[in-house]
Amino acid sequence: MGIVVFGAVFVDIKGFPDDIYIPDGRNVGHVEYIHGGVSRNVVEDIANIELRPTFVSIVDDSALGQDVVRKLNNHKVNTDYVLTIPGGMGTWLAVFDHSGNLAGSISQRPNLMPILDLLEEKGDEIFANADSVIVEVDMDRDIIKKVVALSKKHNKKLFGVVSNMSIAVERRDFLQNFDCFICNQLEAGMFFMEDYADRTPEELCEILAKRVTLGKIPAMIVTMGDHGAVYADLTGDKGICPPQKVRVKD
């Protein structure tokens, strides 16, 4: 079954102005509808490097939901555990300014609790065949508890990613059960209630090493955009991964 990824599917609705963006005025531009969601993006990226992952999620019972599943299947993602339920997908509405920077956004989260029912019914089947597991840590608490329990039962590595850090900070107690937690520089600042915006990779690496020790978090990776990423774990291992050239799409 390969890597199993748990999380929400979002539809990203993005607005781009044709001219200078006026926050309190009308702006002419264009709107794009994009399949999104952190876990959906992650599972597609994993599939793109030929690792044949499995996705556990929910989509709407609509043409758009069918299109999400069709695209994932085209990328060789196993969607056998993607449920089809009315209102199953979330929505992210975002407006960008004339420089391409995010000017504002609103997120509507889906109801993911049907995944808990799926885990009660087929959890052992899913985890027994998994190589490792990735889950959005800001999913419903009961779902995270079940994922953690099944990971321990079947001795599977558990990795956490984040969609909404405001919710994820309430899951601190769970992170000690994860093999690794991955977030970006801004999210790390929110998580540890500090400002890391101007920190260099060298500085953040040292800070992260201290923070994972104090928080008893087994390991963390913090991405830093064009500065690469830093990592640290409870064994004292830490370091910096330099950036690689990529084509930025979004």
Which ranges hold each PLM region?
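A glycine-rich helix N-cap at a beta->alpha junction
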Residues: 71-86
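Structural alpha-helical scaffold elements that stabilize or flank donor/cofactor-binding regions
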Residues: 125-126, 173-174, 213
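Short beta-strand scaffold segments in enzyme catalytic cores
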Residues: 91-95, 104, 228-232
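Conserved phosphate-binding/catalytic loop of the ribokinase/pfkB sugar-kinase fold
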Residues: 84, 94-132, 137
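Conserved beta-alpha-beta core of the PfkB/ribokinase-like small-molecule kinase fold
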Residues: 132-206, 227-229
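Glycine-rich phosphate/adenosyl-contacting loop at the front of the ribokinase-like
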Residues: 1-58, 63-70, 74, 92, ...
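Conserved phosphate-binding/catalytic region of the ribokinase-like
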Residues: 3-4, 27, 199-250
